[in-house]
Amino acid sequence: MKRYVFMLSDGTGITAETLGNSLITQFENIQFEKITIPYIDSTHRAESVVLRINQCFSEQGTKPLVFMTLVDPEIRQAIKKAHACVFDLFSIFIGPLENELEEKSSYTVGRTHGVANVKSYSHRIEAIDFALSHDDGIKTRGYDKADIILIGVSRCGKTPSCLYMALQYGILAANYPFTEEDLVGFRLPDVLRPYKQKLFGLTIDAQRLQQIRSERRPNSKYASAEQCRLEVTEVEAMYQRENIPYINSTKYSIEEISTKVLAIAGLQRKI
């Protein structure tokens, strides 16, 4: 079975996508054709979107699902005229909030992802710059400023996790990869020892690590099953010996890895 899913927003569409995807992934036997339409900022544009939704209804014979985060009441009403099952994610929550807070919403578009909060925006940029300049052990001098330092073998998810934490949470995240040389008589590298309280380890199943590395450098010692097993075994033993917290990243998305790391490390959002 196939169903069309529209994610509609008067901003970037990130919130509608996030909430919509979280819900539809619970239905594994249905194939979803996802369409995101951001910046619906007028009733004229909303009407053109309605035509597109109705066309999908005519072609498929089933109502498209519509997840929308639209602030303007007139634009929301225009979308609700579509032949679709509409989930108005804004009004679901804003009414009860107005009642509880005893204050009317300002109905301002773009509050979530805008740059109105200059301090927050500047901190996000600083965090991204920090993650990029302290990626892959390139620069260790700034580790004293880091909120967290991810460590682990090559290709276990350190870099994307650091970038995600920087972008979404404003966390100053560095990462350090263990090389083949580090694994000889393996112990915690001296450069990391002064920052031991900031260290958080990632590990990964050896079979999955081999698959990832084979895509990058096929038929190499680096990607061999034996090498992957050795590195994973040694690094996990070191984590336990040094009492460094760690998680296995094999079955988790970058978003899940990042949130688990922050929760275990006790770090809070900065933006």
Curated annotation (Swiss-Prot):
It comes from the Bacteria. Keywords: Kinase, Nucleotide-binding, Serine/threonine-protein kinase, Transferase. It catalyses: [pyruvate, water dikinase] + ADP = [pyruvate, water dikinase]-phosphate + AMP + H(+); [pyruvate, water dikinase]-phosphate + phosphate + H(+) = [pyruvate, water dikinase] + diphosphate. GO terms for molecular function: ADP binding; ATP binding; phosphotransferase activity, phosphate group as acceptor; protein serine/threonine kinase activity. Pfam families: Kinase-PPPase. Signal peptide: none annotated. The keyword GTP-binding does not apply. ADP binds at G152, V153, S154, R155, C156, G157, K158, T159. Its EC number is 2.7.11.33, 2.7.4.28. InterPro entries: Kinase-pyrophosphorylase (IPR005177), PSRP (IPR026530). Disulfide bonds: none annotated. Belongs to the pyruvate, phosphate/water dikinase regulatory protein family. PSRP subfamily. PANTHER family: PYRUVATE, PHOSPHATE DIKINASE REGULATORY PROTEIN 1, CHLOROPLASTIC. HAMAP family: PSRP (MF_01062). Bifunctional serine/threonine kinase and phosphorylase involved in the regulation of the phosphoenolpyruvate synthase (PEPS) by catalyzing its phosphorylation/dephosphorylation. This is Putative phosphoenolpyruvate synthase regulatory protein. It comes from Legionella pneumophila (strain Lens).
